[in-house]
């Protein structure tokens, strides 16, 4: 056994070495020494082995300089030079990256009296069109480091320095590092670093590349009230954060083990929203009678994570799935031993970020690309304002451009004025990519060649001014362009006194126009007469008894779409263009299924989930009708609510309330990267899902059978409240008489009632069977069907394991024993009753809800007894702003 233990550690060492070797090539790194000259110069910084190069290929403006020689020995080489921007309000670096990927972007600023003025600058940093941070230099040798984790929406990124006062913006270095997309998850916005610390066992400065393959800068933290523990053995750091070995091999624990440990900090902005990432690994070899288990709460007892046991020599990363805030900017985190613990809490590393809201959308990417090409083609880099995003923000729009700013999509260019811009050569085809352009002024330049035909294809274009270009061929106007002029949809100015006009038509045209006008007046009178007749009839109709119901009860039987008025409810019907707007052209995918794809949306300021029917779905429209019919007439706090629906031509969509925490299966498996669901969470989710299902059976008239109950159809909101979803297969059954309905079998393998499958007779007990399978998943966190098991189906596997009389052998090991044993037995027995092969011997959902409430009560009693064991004293230390941690010394 001992040899196996060491063999596993050797594997971890080998993996770590491979990752280290792989990291040496700095793949994806962009490391710019700003102001470095000449252009060809590159070098490797000795203390980090990072290769830096000049920034000249990434920016068109600025002056180069160097910090005072007296200060150079205090800093790494990449901050010896600076690039400053005395001209222009906004100056931007343009970096080519991979769209929709996550990057760490870091700007470093060391003044070093480079200009001899001894004036400490202050200015703003922008990421694309959005403000990132404010830079305030506090001293000649103070290092100001600003870092953000950002998902780039396009294949290029602008990092801009914006002048906000009398002083001149400058930058020393700009670094971009790729990250795993699965790391640092947020609901929205980007992450600006506040602090990133680790707890070394000996005095140390900071850690970065090549110990950290992503070149994150880890600052050491020491405190009089804390002691440090460490290990020489390797740590398994194989999660999406790729934590450095040197960071995870050490940890801090409070000196006074009997008292809770208080960790606090104050954000620079009181109302800032924050994400906190804590990294844990057990670095001590615990004996059989030693246990390290603790709870984490924050800001007065709000639960962060319960019953945490750091895994032995293996990483566990805990973070909040949504942003948290504090009214005064102060955050207090308390780490307290549980009653089962013999050892104090530990913490290996901590990262704190504030949210940068990305509210300003970037200009349409095709138009940005076109403008960059136009800028390069005509050598327009000398235009001071032509930096960063062409349109956004509006305050810094490029000179000569006018833009439109739609609410839900990126800005668009609607006019381009390059009058007198010293343009030479032919008219570039990149102009044709500005598809919403209405006005184009290329006058008073030295353009040559023919007038391009693509002008005629630009449907939005209303005015073109080509005057003052003596070498432009104005004699050959393309026929298609002449037709646009003839139709008066376009004005073409060719010279100072020459505007291309429509070719003259026959003299009969005025008579035709007069006749058309008379006919138009007559038609208008006829329409008005018809309108008043219809209006009078409508008034009479409204005096009759109340209107017919908007929704026909029961199941819609017809499969012909044109004959289904029963699902048309004007108050909730949404058009396809509205769907496009609310989803931002289907930008963010939440999930995919047999029905189609589910997208994130925003309707009237509220988040929604938009499920689009796939055109390839054979039974999709039938299920669509069934789900609309059901959801328009049922309302329950534990059923996902229907906000609206779209039935617009071939486009079908269901718009639901948004469930921020995804489905139960994702949360059980850990795919969402959040905390392990506690036993208390699981019991509450089971009760709430059962209540929703019980309502369908007993609260609806006629009663409903869901037919597809499974963990992926139980959705969780931001508070982990459960709601039953996906009613596309639901069926009603009679109130009186027979309690079964004969129907074609439908459902999901593994959850499907075998009696229903065998007989085609559907009843509410079919849902009870499926829910029993869900309960077994909740308890065991095992797949429903696993062919590698001796008994593949979860029902059979649990029954077999229970013959040994040990409930612990089937309960999810991620719970680490943190559950009420009596409650676990009770819920497993209930689940096995639900999956009885005979439907007559299964309980009703009303009985299931009652039994589950008993399980919740048992768990609550256990929790209250455990929490009384917490000590009330505290040990605390604080974290200050990231500026105090900035690494500058070599």
Curated annotation (Swiss-Prot):
It comes from Arabidopsis thaliana. Keywords: ATP-binding, Glycoprotein, Kinase, Leucine-rich repeat, Membrane, Nucleotide-binding, Phosphoprotein, Receptor, Repeat, Serine/threonine-protein kinase, Signal, Transferase, Transmembrane, Transmembrane helix. Its main location: membrane. The modification Phosphothreonine is found at residues 575, 743, 748. GO terms for molecular function: ATP binding; protein serine kinase activity; protein serine/threonine kinase activity. It is a single-pass type I membrane protein. Residues 584-856 form the Protein kinase domain. Belongs to the protein kinase superfamily. Ser/Thr protein kinase family. It is found in: Membrane. Residues 24-513 are extracellular. ATP binds at residues 590-598, 611. InterPro entries: Kinase-like_dom_sf (IPR011009), Leu-rich_rpt (IPR001611), LRR_dom_sf (IPR032675), Malectin-like_Carb-bd_dom (IPR024788), Prot_kinase_dom (IPR000719), Protein_kinase_ATP_BS (IPR017441), Ser-Thr/Tyr_kinase_cat_dom (IPR001245), Ser/Thr_kinase_AS (IPR008271). The chain crosses the membrane at residues 514-534. This is Probable LRR receptor-like serine/threonine-protein kinase At1g51860. It catalyses: L-seryl-[protein] + ATP = O-phospho-L-seryl-[protein] + ADP + H(+); L-threonyl-[protein] + ATP = O-phospho-L-threonyl-[protein] + ADP + H(+). Residues 535-890 are cytoplasmic. Residues 1-23 form the signal peptide. The modification Phosphoserine is found at residue 742. The active site is at 708 (proton acceptor). LRR repeats lie at residues 412-435, 436-458, 460-481. Glycans are attached at residues 49, 96, 142, 181, 256, 285, 289, 295, 312, 332, 340, 402, 419, 465, 473, 497. GO terms for cellular component: membrane.
């Amino acid at each position: 056994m001992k040899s196996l233990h060491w063999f596993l550690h050797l594997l971890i060492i080998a993996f770590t070495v491979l990752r280290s070797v792989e990291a040496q090539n700095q793949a994806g790194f962009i490391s710019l020494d700003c102001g470095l000259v000449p252009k060809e110069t590159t070098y490797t910084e000795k203390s980090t082995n990072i290769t830096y190069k000049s920034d000249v290929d990434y920016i068109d403006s600025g002056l180069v300089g160097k910090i005072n020689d007296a200060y150079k020995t205090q800093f790494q080489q990449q901050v010896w030079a600076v690039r400053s921007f005395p001209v222009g309000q906004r100056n931007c670096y343009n970096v080519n990256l991979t769209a929709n990927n996550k990057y760490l972007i870091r700007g470093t600023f060391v003044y070093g009296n480079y200009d001899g003025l001894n004036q400490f600058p202050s200015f703003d940093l922008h990421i694309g069109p959005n403000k990132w941070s404010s830079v305030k230099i506090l001293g000649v040798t103070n290092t100001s480091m600003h870092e953000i984790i950002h998902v780039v929406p396009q294949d290029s990124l602008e990092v801009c320095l914006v002048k906000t006062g009398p002083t001149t913006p400058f930058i020393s270095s700009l670094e971009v590092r790729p990250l795993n997309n699965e790391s640092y998850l947020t609901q929205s916005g980007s992450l600006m670093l506040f602090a990133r610390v680790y707890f070394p066992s000996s005095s140390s400065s900071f850690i970065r590349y090549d110990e950290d393959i992503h070149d994150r800068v880890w600052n050491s933290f020491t405190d009089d009230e804390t002691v440090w523990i460490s290990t020489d053995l390797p740590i398994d750091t194989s999660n999406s954060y790729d934590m450095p070995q040197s960071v995870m091999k050490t940890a801090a624990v409070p000196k006074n083990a009997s008292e809770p440990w208080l960790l606090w900090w104050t954000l620079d902005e009181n109302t800032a929203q924050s994400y906190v990432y804590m990294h844990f690994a057990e670095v001590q070899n615990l004996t059989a009678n030693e246990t390290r288990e603790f709870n984490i709460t924050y800001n007065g007892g709000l639960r962060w994570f319960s019953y945490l046991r750091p895994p032995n020599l293996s990483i566990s990363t805990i973070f909040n799935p949504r942003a948290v805030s504090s009214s005064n900017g102060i955050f207090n985190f308390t780490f307290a031993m549980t009653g089962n613990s013999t050892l104090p809490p530990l913490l290996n590393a901590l990262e704190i970020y504030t949210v940068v809201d990305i509210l300003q959308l970037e200009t349409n990417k095709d138009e940005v690309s076109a403008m960059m090409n136009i800028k390069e083609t005509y050598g327009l880099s000398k235009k001071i304002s032509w930096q960063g995003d062409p349109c956004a923000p509006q305050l810094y729009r490029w000179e000569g451009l006018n833009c439109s700013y739609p609410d839900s999509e990126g800005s668009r260019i609607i006019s381009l004025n390059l009058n007198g811009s010293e343009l030479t050569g032919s008219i570039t085809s990149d102009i044709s990519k500005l598809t919403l352009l209405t006005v184009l002024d290329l006058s008073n330049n030295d353009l040559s060649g023919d007038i391009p035909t693509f002008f005629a294809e630009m449907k939005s274009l209303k005015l073109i001014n080509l005057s003052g270009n003596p070498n432009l061929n104005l004699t050959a106007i393309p026929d298609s362009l002449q037709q646009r002029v003839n139709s008066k949809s376009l004005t073409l100015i060719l010279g100072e006194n020459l505007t291309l006009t429509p070719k003259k038509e026959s003299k009969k045209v005025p008579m035709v126009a007069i006749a058309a006008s008379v006919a138009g007046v007559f038609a208008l009178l006829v329409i008005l007469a018809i309108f008043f007749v219809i209006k009078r009839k409508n008034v009479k109709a409204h005096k009759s008894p109340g209107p017919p119901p908007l929704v026909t009860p029961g199941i819609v039987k017809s499969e012909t779409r044109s004959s289904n008025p029963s699902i048309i409810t004007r108050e909730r019907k949404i058009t396809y263009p509205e769907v496009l707007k609310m989803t931002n052209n289907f930008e963010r995918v939440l999930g995919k299924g047999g029905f189609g794809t589910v997208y994130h949306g925003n309707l009237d300021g509220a988040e929604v989930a938009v499920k689009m029917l796939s055109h390839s779905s054979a039974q999709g429209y039938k299920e669509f009708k069934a789900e609309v019919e059901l959801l328009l007439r049922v309302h329950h706090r534990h059923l996902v609510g229907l906000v609206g629906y779209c039935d617009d031509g071939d486009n079908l969509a269901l718009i639901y309330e948004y469930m921020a925490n995804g489905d139960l299966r994702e949360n059980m498996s850990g795919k969402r990267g959040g905390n392990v669901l506690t036993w208390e969470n699981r019991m509450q989710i089971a009760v709430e899902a059962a209540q929703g299902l019980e309502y369908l059976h007993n609260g609806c008239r006629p009663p409903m059978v869901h037919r597809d109950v499974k963990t992926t159809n139980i959705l969780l909101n931001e508070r982990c409240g459960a709601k039953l979803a996906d009613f596309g297969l639901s069926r009603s059954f009679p109130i009186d008489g027979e309690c079964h309905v004969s129907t074609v079998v439908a459902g999901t393998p593994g959850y499907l009632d075998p009696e229903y499958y065998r007989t085609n007779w559907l009843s509410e007990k079919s849902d009870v069977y499926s829910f029993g399978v869900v309960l077994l998943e909740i308890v065991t966190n095992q797949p429903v069907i696993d062919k590698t098991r001796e008994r593949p189906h979860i029902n059979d596997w649990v029954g077999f394991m229970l013959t040994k009389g040990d409930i612990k052998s089937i309960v999810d090991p991620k719970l680490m024993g943190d559950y009420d044993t009596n409650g676990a037995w009770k819920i497993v027995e209930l689940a096995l009753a639900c999956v009885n092969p005979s439907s007559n011997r299964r309980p009703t959902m009303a009985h299931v809800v009652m039994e589950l409430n008993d399980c919740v009560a048992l768990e609550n009693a256990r929790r209250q007894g455990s929490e009384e064991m917490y000590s009330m004293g505290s040990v605390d230390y604080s974290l200050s702003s990231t500026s105090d941690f900035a690494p500058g010394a070599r």
